[in-house]
């Protein structure tokens, strides 16, 4: 990895909420009622330069998931991992392993 690349990755990871807001803006164009959260190593403060930013989108428009993914991955330069879930999937799956302090809503 080049020093420039490492520096850019550290900046993205350190400013993860800025990246998450960028993702949220894109998602809200498709689903204005979606909720967007960040979780994982960046929230815990345990990231490395090879980490990504885990972003969870809770949407009732799950049929738009491919469109959401394409738009985000096309427009966002930062290393993000997009997770899309219905409210039911969030409550039945993600809530099983995410503690409240490990997930942050993007405002």
Where in the sequence are the language-model features?
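Catalytic core of pol beta-like nucleotidyltransferases
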Residues: 1-34, 43-50, 59-107
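Glycine-rich beta-strand-to-loop/alpha-helix junction loops that act as flexible
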Residues: 39-41
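Structural signature of the urease/amidohydrolase superfamily beta/alpha-barrel
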Residues: 54-55
């Amino acid at each position: 990895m080049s020093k420039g690349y490492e520096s850019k990755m550290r900046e993205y990871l350190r400013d993860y909420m800025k990246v998450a807001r960028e993702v949220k803006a894109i998602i809200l164009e498709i689903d204005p009622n979606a909720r967007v959260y960040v979780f994982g190593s960046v929230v815990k403060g345990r990231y490395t330069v090879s980490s990504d930013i885990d972003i969870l989108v809770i949407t009732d428009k799950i049929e738009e998931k491919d469109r959401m993914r394409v738009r985000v991955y096309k427009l966002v330069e930062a290393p993000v991992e997009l997770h899309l879930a219905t409210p039911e999937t969030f409550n039945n799956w993600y809530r099983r392993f995410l503690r409240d302090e490990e997930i942050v809503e993007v405002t």
